[in-house]
Regions:
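Glycine-rich phosphate-binding loop of ATP-dependent small-molecule kinases
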Residues: 1-205
Length: 205
C-alpha cells in the first residue's frame, strides 16, 4: 500500500478541486487500509499521552466537507483509541438564540481545547462564510449593525469575515492551539452513491 505522505494533503495557494483526486489510495485492499488505520490510531494515542504530560499545547482539528463525506466515520474510527477525557467533539448546528446574542465566533471560542487536550470541530467556523454566503438571509438573524436587509451584505462584508477568521486562527495559534484543517473531498458520483445507500438504510429500519 502506498505510504501516507502529509505533503499529498497540503493545500498551498489557490486550487481547483476538479483537478484533485478524491481517492489517493484507489486500488488498495481493505485489509491494507485497516492495517494502516490501526497504526495511525496507536500513534495518535501515544502522542496524546505525550501532549497531555507536556501541557503546553492544545490541538484543534477542523473537519469540513459535504454531507456523506465521512466526517462522522473518521471521528469514530480515528479517535476510538483516545482517552475520552482528552478529546472533545463539537458539531456546530444552526446557532441557537443564546449564540445569536454573541458574535459568530463566540461559540467556537468556547469549544477550543484546553492545553494538553484535543478538540474536533465537525463542521467549523468556515460555515460562517460558506452556508451563509449561499443563504445570506441567515445573516439577518445575527442583528448586525448596518445590516437591515440582505442587500446590505456587500462583497466587502465577506472579505471582512475572512479576515476575522484568519485573525481568529492566528490568535489561537500564537497562544498554544495547534490548528489542523481537513477538507473531505468527495466526487459527485460517490456522494450520490452514499446518499442512495443512506436512504436504503433508512427504509430498511
Amino acid at each position: 500500500m502506498k505510504s501516507i505522505n502529509p505533503d499529498d494533503f497540503k493545500v498551498i495557494g489557490k486550487i481547483d478541486l476538479s483537478k484533485i483526486p478524491t481517492n489517493l489510495f484507489n486500488g488498495a485492499s481493505e485489509d491494507a487500509k485497516e492495517e494502516k488505520l490501526d497504526k495511525v490510531q496507536t500513534k495518535l494515542s501515544e502522542l496524546q499521552d505525550v501532549m497531555y504530560a507536556h501541557n503546553r499545547y492544545g490541538v484543534l482539528i477542523c473537519l469540513q466537507g459535504m454531507d456523506t463525506s465521512g466526517k462522522d466515520s473518521l471521528i469514530r474510527e480515528v479517535f476510538k483509541e483516545f482517552n475520552p477525557r482528552g478529546v472533545e467533539v463539537h458539531s456546530f448546528k444552526t446557532p441557537n438564540s443564546t449564540e445569536l446574542e454573541h458574535d459568530y465566533l463566540w461559540r467556537h471560542y468556547l469549544a477550543l481545547p484546553e492545553k494538553g487536550k484535543f478538540a474536533v470541530f465537525n463542521r467549523t467556523h468556515y460555515e460562517n462564510v460558506l452556508v451563509t454566503r449561499v443563504h445570506p438571509e441567515y445573516i439577518m438573524n445575527e442583528n448586525l449593525p448596518g445590516i437591515e436587509k440582505v442587500e446590505d451584505i456587500t462583497p466587502q462584508f465577506w472579505e471582512d469575515r475572512l479576515e476575522q477568521i484568519n485573525n481568529f486562527e492566528k490568535h489561537i495559534s500564537q497562544n498554544g492551539t495547534i490548528v489542523l484543517k481537513f477538507y473531505f473531498h468527495l466526487s459527485k458520483e460517490e456522494q450520490r452513491k452514499r446518499l442512495l445507500r443512506r436512504l436504503e438504510e433508512v427504509e430498511h429500519h
